[in-house]
Structures are given as structure tokens and as C-alpha cells.
């Protein structure tokens, strides 16, 4: 059970075990379709370093409070609070928010002023309140008070896109799906030499590749996605990647170029 392995899921695995949980053929095919050089060799090399990546997560991963729950409403609402917002800011209001609004119905019945006061520190207050209200309506009016388990339905509230919907399915309902945001897209580009499209989070090709790379075992899928998110935030940053302290540096095209370790 994933819940027994919170906050990060399964962080200990061998490369051989991992290989039985990914769709290597589909992933390689997606790399070839994207014109990635030496697709199979690159995929194999990266897969060998994923166990180190998960081990790194177990030591350096960020232990946010929402990583200790699989409660669907907490997961869904938290992902809305995290939109365009730092995790540390959301962590500060996490307990007061869910004390006040432990269910979707509590948000539906809340005074506008109370809801606004609780999310004010995060900014984008109008956006946030509207999305939370619509998410609560979705659960209560359309789904008997429960968070939907359908990718399309989860994207019905205003400004809820594939990232938030997929994160909900992954973290609450243990569906082994890939998350595509700026961090995971940047790592994909650097590690594989993957030529990113203009909007990676809307690209079917990017999802096809990363969904094939995400392990089909839920606890591993959780760990793999969290590892990419945290690696992007803590090591593989946009402007200053810290390759010397990165667990997948030996297999990363970008990180190994300077040391002549790239696949020829
Ligand atoms: S080696 Fe460098 S570029 Fe590659 S994933 Fe790690 S931090 Fe990013």
C-alpha cells in the first residue's frame, strides 16, 4: 500500500526490478519519434540511475504535510493551492485551511470572506477562490461529495489543467501517471536531449514518453514523480543546475557533456 510508505512511496528498488515496471518499448519509440539520438542506449542508461534518484529522494525529498495523506479532497484542494505558488507558502496555511474546510461541502458552505482570508497569503485570491468553489461544486453536485476519479472530470473547474488532475489521480488514487510541469519538462530535456515543444504540459508526445517511463507500480510511480519534482526544485534548477550533486548525473546528457560521458 502506498499509504504505508508515505511520504515518498517506494524509494528502494534495483534497476532490474524497475525495468519490469516500465514500458521500455513505448518509451524508446517515443524518444525515436521525438528525434532523440541513441534513444535506446539513452533510455537504458537513465533507467540504471533511477534507483539512485529514488534513494536521493528518501534523504533529500521535501516533507510537505500533503505528502503524508492520500485523502482525495486534501490532495485535490492542495494541488489547487499550489498552482503558481511556492510549496513553503502553502505549507504555512495547510493546517488552518483543512481545519476550516475538511470537505468539499465545507468550501461550498463557507463565507466568501473566510475563504478569501485563508488563501490571501498565497496571492491570486480571486483565481484561487473561484477554482476551489468550482472544485467543491464538482465533488458535491456532480459526484455525491467525492472527488472524481476521472481525468476529464477533474479538469472541469476553472483553470484546472492536466497537471492538477493527474497529480490528484497519482497521489490520491494511486494511478501511475506522469506529471508534466516546468521542472519535469526541463529534466526530460536535459537528461535525454529531448526537444521540448512550446507547451510540454499540453503535448501528447511528451505524455506518451513520460507515462511509459513512470513505473506501473503505484508506490514507485509516486516516488518517481516526487523525485523529479524535487530534483527540479533542488538540483536541476532552471538557471543553475547543480550537476555535481545530482544522483542521475552519470546518465544525463546535459550533465555529462563537460566530462565526456555522453552517449556517442
Ligand atoms: S546532471 Fe545536471 S542537468 Fe542533468 S538532471 Fe542532474 S542537475 Fe539536471
Predicted regions and their residues:
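Extended substrate/cofactor- or partner-recognition/assembly subdomains adjacent to catalytic sites
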Residues: 47
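Intrinsically disordered, low-complexity, compositionally biased regions/tails
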Residues: 13, 262-264
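Short, contiguous pre-domain boundary segments
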Residues: 14-43
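Catalytic cores of DNA base-excision repair glycosylases
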Residues: 38, 43, 52-262
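Intrinsically disordered, low-complexity N-terminal extensions of nucleic-acid-metabolism proteins
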Residues: 1-18
Amino acid at each position: 500500500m502506498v499509504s504505508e510508505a508515505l511520504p515518498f512511496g517506494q524509494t528502494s528498488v534495483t534497476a532490474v526490478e524497475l525495468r519490469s515496471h516500465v514500458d521500455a518499448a513505448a518509451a524508446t519509440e517515443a524518444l525515436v519519434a521525438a528525434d532523440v539520438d541513441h534513444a535506446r542506449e539513452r533510455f537504458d542508461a537513465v533507467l540504471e540511475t533511477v534507483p539512485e534518484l529514488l534513494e536521493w529522494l528518501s534523504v533529500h525529498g521535501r516533507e510537505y504535510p500533503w505528502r503524508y495523506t492520500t485523502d482525495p479532497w486534501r490532495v485535490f484542494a492542495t494541488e489547487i493551492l499550489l498552482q503558481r505558488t511556492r510549496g513553503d507558502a502553502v505549507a504555512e496555511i495547510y493546517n488552518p485551511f483543512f481545519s476550516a474546510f475538511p470537505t468539499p461541502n465545507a468550501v461550498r458552505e463557507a463565507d466568501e470572506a473566510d475563504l478569501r482570508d485563508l488563501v490571501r497569503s498565497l496571492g491570486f485570491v480571486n483565481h484561487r477562490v473561484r477554482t476551489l468553489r468550482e472544485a467543491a461544486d464538482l465533488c458535491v453536485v456532480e459526484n455525491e461529495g467525492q472527488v472524481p476519479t476521472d481525468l476529464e472530470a477533474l479538469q472541469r473547474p476553472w483553470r484546472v489543467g492536466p497537471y492538477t488532475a493527474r497529480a490528484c489521480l497519482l497521489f490520491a488514487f494511486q494511478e501511475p501517471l506522469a506529471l508534466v510541469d516546468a521542472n519535469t519538462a526541463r529534466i526530460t530535456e536535459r537528461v535525454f536531449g529531448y526537444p521540448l515543444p512550446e507547451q510540454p504540459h499540453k503535448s501528447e508526445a511528451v505524455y506518451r514518453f513520460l507515462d511509459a517511463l513512470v513505473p506501473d507500480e503505484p508506490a514507485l510511480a509516486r516516488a518517481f514523480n516526487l523525485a523529479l519534482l524535487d530534483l527540479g526544485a533542488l538540483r536541476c534548477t532552471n538557471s543553475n543546475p547543480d550537476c555535481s550533486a545530482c544522483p542521475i548525473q552519470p546518465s544525463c546528457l546535459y550533465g555529462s557533456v563537460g566530462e565526456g560521458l555522453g552517449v556517442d
